[in-house]
């Protein structure tokens, strides 16, 4: 009996011990693995922190360090200009550009014949958004892209002027050289661009400047003040150069009433219409169409030739001379008529005096008798 009880106790005790031991051993394994992994992470972080402490790098980041570096970057040396992007470029600060605009505006208004004022005004008003728009227009056109790629220049060297003189009269090249000879100008009179910052934008403005005489040639407008204003209006409506718009707005203020009347009634309407509805002139590769018929070119571009300004001026001055002659003749006739009236009055007075003298003599004789 005792033996069976002991055996049962032993079996019970052994079964009781086996389960907890097995459970404890599995828990220990998992705990050991987790502790090892977590400890390795902590140990590696501790190693990193210890290394930073040893190298004096812990908590060394200055919160003002970025701000200090930004100030040093912005400050830089005082009055130091960036390097030029193209030959002859002159870098200007914004206040210098404003002063140049102010001075050239006043100079252009009172002395439009001085090219230096016109040049400075053109570049000081050729702001980047305007030139970027022209750049986009050229890049959107196959011919415009070719011009930007090849960078042609219009000078007496690049153009064979003798060849242009040999072309037929109805060609663009012959019309161009005829206009140059008549007005006494040369392709070399266009001053290089100096004050525009971007190199490609500077070339675009240079291209516009050198093509100006072609606009005169295809329209037939001379370089006298009315012709220049008319071409400026055409340029502004077609290309959008700010200086052209300023010239169209303020230049007529110094003209005579007869000149303003011609612009208002004839050339402003013509320039606005043709500038708006014609194709972009900035995309014309003039050097490659010099032998093209000028009338065909006008039709393709949608440009009408305006009335001849020189003929209108001749007619006006001839009319003024006739009016002056008529006034002089009328004044002379009036003087002659007055002289005749005065002569008649003098003759009448003389006759009256002689008649009265004749009447007085007989009465005196009778009294004496």
Swiss-Prot record:
The keyword Membrane applies. Its cofactor is Zn(2+). Residues 329-360 have a biased composition (Low complexity). Pfam families: Coq4. GO terms for biological process: ubiquinone biosynthetic process. Keywords: Lyase, Membrane, Metal-binding, Mitochondrion, Mitochondrion inner membrane, Transit peptide, Ubiquinone biosynthesis, Zinc. Zn(2+) binds at residues 212-213, 216, 228. It is found in: Mitochondrion inner membrane. InterPro entries: Coq4, Coq4_euk. GO terms for cellular component: extrinsic component of mitochondrial inner membrane. Residues 329-369 are annotated as: Disordered. Component of a multi-subunit COQ enzyme complex, composed of at least COQ3, COQ4, COQ5, COQ6, COQ7 and COQ9. Lyase that catalyzes the C1-decarboxylation of 4-hydroxy-3-methoxy-5-(all-trans-polyprenyl)benzoic acid into 2-methoxy-6-(all-trans-polyprenyl)phenol during ubiquinone biosynthesis. Belongs to the COQ4 family. This is Ubiquinone biosynthesis protein COQ4, mitochondrial. It comes from Lodderomyces elongisporus (strain ATCC 11503 / CBS 2605 / JCM 1781 / NBRC 1676 / NRRL YB-4239).
């Amino acid at each position: 009996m005792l033996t069976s009880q002991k055996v049962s106790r032993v079996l019970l005790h052994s079964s009781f011990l086996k389960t907890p031991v097995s459970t404890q051993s599995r828990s220990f394994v998992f705990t050991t693995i987790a502790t090892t992994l977590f400890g390795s992470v902590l140990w590696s972080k501790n190693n990193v922190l210890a290394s930073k402490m040893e190298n004096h790098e812990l908590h060394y980041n200055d919160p003002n360090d970025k701000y200090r570096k930004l100030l040093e970057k912005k400050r830089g040396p005082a009055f130091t200009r960036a390097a030029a992007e193209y030959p002859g470029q002159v870098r200007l600060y914004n206040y210098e550009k404003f002063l140049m605009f102010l001075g050239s505006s006043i100079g252009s208004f009172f002395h439009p014949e001085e090219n230096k004022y016109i040049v400075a005004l053109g570049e000081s008003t050729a702001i980047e958004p305007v030139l970027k728009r022209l750049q986009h227009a050229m890049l959107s056109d196959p011919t415009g892209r070719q011009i930007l790629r090849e960078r042609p220049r219009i000078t007496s060297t690049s153009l064979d002027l003798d060849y242009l003189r040999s072309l037929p009269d109805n060609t663009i090249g012959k019309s161009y050289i005829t206009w140059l000879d008549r007005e006494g100008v040369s392709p070399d009179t266009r001053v290089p661009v100096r004050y525009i910052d971007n190199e490609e934008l500077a070339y675009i403005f240079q291209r516009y400047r050198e093509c100006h005489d072609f606009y005169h040639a295809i329209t037939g407008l001379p370089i006298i003040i009315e012709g220049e204003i008319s071409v400026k209006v055409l340029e502004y409506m077609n290309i959008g150069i700010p200086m052209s718009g300023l010239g169209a707005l303020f230049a007529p203020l110094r003209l005579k009433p007869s000149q303003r009347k011609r612009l208002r009634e004839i050339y402003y309407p013509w320039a606005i219409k043709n500038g708006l509805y014609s194709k972009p002139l900035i995309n014309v590769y003039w050097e490659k169409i010099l032998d093209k018929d000028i009338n065909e070119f006008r039709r393709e571009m949608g440009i009408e030739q305006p009335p001849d300004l020189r003929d209108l001026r001749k007619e006006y001055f001839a009319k003024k001379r006739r009016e002056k002659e008529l006034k002089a003749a009328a004044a002379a006739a009036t003087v002659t008529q007055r002289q005749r009236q005065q002569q008649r009055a003098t003759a009448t007075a003389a006759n009256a005096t002689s008649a009265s003298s004749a009447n007085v003599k007989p009465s005196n004789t009778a009294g004496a008798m």
